């Protein structure tokens, strides 16, 4: 769970109701991931939501755009506020529906750290140019390679293996990876064989050096 607000003064002002975004980052049946939005009266209203993986949430609207959350949690690490807030403000001016400030996300040493939903990809040390690239690529169904630190639905080993295979195969579609399996020091990354063919897959085996994985 991430706590979010809009950059600047508007994000510090009281408002009517609470925005809730529900990211279905993976699905039980292999179907597409998706993002939903709905309002609740207050934080207690979260307890009334019946959220089920891959299933529509009652009263929620499915969104046709991603969310880009930029960590500005200065109490966790001052670098997140110092580097995150200017980036969040600049990106919010360009993409007001997409960009929010967020509470701590992993990897504050990579500030400004950010998360792209609904796919749950993390990014670090992005310039304004690359942050813009992350958003625009996501809107076209592409994972932006620069600064990408892995997809949070996988283990750290799986995240490293996925990115290694994506770079080797030069494939960056958000839906190109069928699954990632990790067993000890070996990972198997399964890619779909082409954007239009989901019946055929290609398997890549990756040898992991666990001491070198820093996600």
Region roles according to the model:
Residues 1-63, 109-122, 126-128, 210:
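Cofactor- and metal-binding active-site motifs of prokaryotic enzymes
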Residues 66-67, 73-90, 98-209:
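Internal, well-folded beta-alpha domain core
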Residues 2-4, 96-99:
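Short amphipathic alpha-helical surface micro-motifs
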Residues 213-215:
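Conserved small/polar residues in nucleotide/adenosyl-binding loops
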């Amino acid at each position: 769970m991430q706590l979010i607000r809009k950059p600047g003064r508007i994000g510090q002002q009281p408002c009517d109701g609470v925005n809730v975004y529900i990211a279905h980052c993976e699905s039980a049946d292999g179907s597409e991931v998706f993002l939903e939005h709905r309002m609740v009266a207050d934080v207690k209203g979260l307890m009334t939501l019946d959220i089920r993986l891959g299933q529509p949430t009652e009263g929620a609207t499915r969104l046709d755009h991603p969310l880009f959350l930029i960590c500005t949690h200065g109490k966790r690490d001052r670098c997140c506020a110092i580097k995150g807030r200017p980036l969040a403000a600049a990106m919010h001016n360009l993409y007001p529906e997409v960009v929010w400030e967020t509470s701590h996300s992993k990897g504050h040493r990579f500030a400004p750290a950010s998360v792209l939903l609904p796919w749950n990809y993390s990014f670090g040390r992005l310039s304004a140019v690359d942050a813009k690239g992350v958003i625009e690529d996501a809107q076209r169904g592409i994972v932006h390679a620069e600064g990408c630190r892995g997809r949070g639905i996988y283990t750290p080993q799986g995240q490293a293996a996925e990115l290694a295979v994506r770079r080797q195969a030069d494939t960056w579609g958000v839906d190109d990876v069928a699954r990632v399996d990790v067993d000890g020091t070996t990972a198997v990354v399964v890619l779909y064989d082409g954007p239009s063919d989901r019946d055929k897959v290609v398997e890549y085996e990756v040898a992991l050096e666990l001491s070198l994985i820093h996600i």
